[in-house]
């Protein structure tokens, strides 16, 4: 399955940030939350920090992490953001770091595409358009890579 992650606008245009393998998790009707997954490539010469996310379809977005603690999977907000060192790659994937969208105002349907805004501490906001995929699909088999 092939999905395209496309740039819409960006204050990070010349910073060397590349987003790939992005998708949003499909939801049933009236679901209050969904998750977003993607890979951040920092091809620039400075470290960057992903500090937040937002989308028109959600009341709020945040960066979260899932970790196993005493045999129980827990999810917590990553309050200081996710550091992506210069020349490095960080993946946000199921079962680990991910974007959490809460207070959904619409169903996210498989095949649709939505714009989300990623906020980075050093280069501001980056808008990306992500496809919605069913729970059984993985965006990490995608071959499309976009430079922003």
Task: Show the residue positions of the predicted features.
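Compact, glycine-rich, soluble single-domain proteins
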Residues: 10-148
């Amino acid at each position: 399955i092939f999905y395209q992650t496309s740039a819409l606008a960006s204050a990070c245009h010349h910073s060397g940030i590349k987003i790939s393998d992005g998708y949003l998790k499909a939801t049933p009707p009236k679901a209050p939350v969904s998750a977003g997954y993607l890979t951040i490539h920092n091809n620039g010469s400075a470290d960057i920090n992903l500090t937040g996310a937002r989308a028109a379809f959600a009341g709020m977005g945040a960066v979260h992490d899932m970790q196993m603690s005493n045999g129980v999977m827990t999810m917590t907000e990553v309050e200081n953001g996710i550091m992506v060192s210069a020349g490095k790659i960080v993946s946000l994937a199921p079962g680990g770091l991910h974007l959490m969208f809460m207070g959904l105002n619409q169903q996210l349907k498989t095949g649709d595409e939505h714009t989300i805004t990623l906020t980075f501490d050093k280069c501001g906001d980056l808008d990306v358009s992500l496809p919605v995929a069913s729970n059984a699909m993985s965006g990490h088999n995608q071959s499309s890579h976009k430079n922003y």
